[in-house]
Amino acid sequence: ITAQRVPMTSVPETVALFNGCGGMSSLLVALGVALFPEAGGSDLVAVVSIVVSVFVGAITFTGSIVAMAKLQGWLSTPAWMQSRLRHAVNIALAVLSLVAAVKLIASGEGGQGLWLLVIGSGLLGVGVTLPIGGANMPVVISLLNSYSGVAAAAAGFVVGSQLLIVAGAMVGAAGLILTQVMCDGMNRSLVSVLFGGALGASSGGGGGGGEYT
């Protein structure tokens, strides 16, 4: 019903919202099993799957919400996010998420490491998506679609669902292929789309790829 009522001009925002819902679903499943290990097991495979599902799911959720808000005109890029400072912030968030993931795997149970991972990866999703301009946003939405599939596949390992693993892998692969095709159509690499804006703006190059809104 929602898809039928949405005008064609708002389809990208709708897809971003659906991606966010998928990422949040995988995140909640992983959190449930992490907080209540009897629901899915606490062996190494289960813990690693929880880490992947939480990390990718949180990035997908926050990144998709930011993408939708930017396309709707509800958000704009802060000035400091257009500089190299954003790379330092994102690296710090990635390191925080990595440390939290290692701590969670080492402990094998939910706790401080789990919530640090949720916060760090969620903020990382915002930090990566917020500086990207509207012209590149469809590529980001396609990549986030791939992420939602990866998160779903990881959640499938968490709960032991082969159907969820297969479906998530298919969505992840299809989204990644579509992302690469879109990048080829724009004659740009995925790295330049995600990280090249501030570098292009600071060096005076990039053929307009550094435009931010």
What are the language-model segments listed below?
Residues 46-60, 164-174:
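Alpha-helical transmembrane segments
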Residues 1-14, 64-79, 124-137, 179-183:
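C-terminal ends of transmembrane helices
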Residues 2-11, 27-43, 107-108:
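Transmembrane alpha-helix boundary signature
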Residues 90-98:
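Core segments of transmembrane alpha-helices
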Residues 9-22, 79-91, 138-147:
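Cytoplasmic-side transmembrane-helix entry/capping segments in multi-pass membrane proteins
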Residues 117-129, 139-185:
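Membrane-embedded transport cores of multi-pass solute transporters
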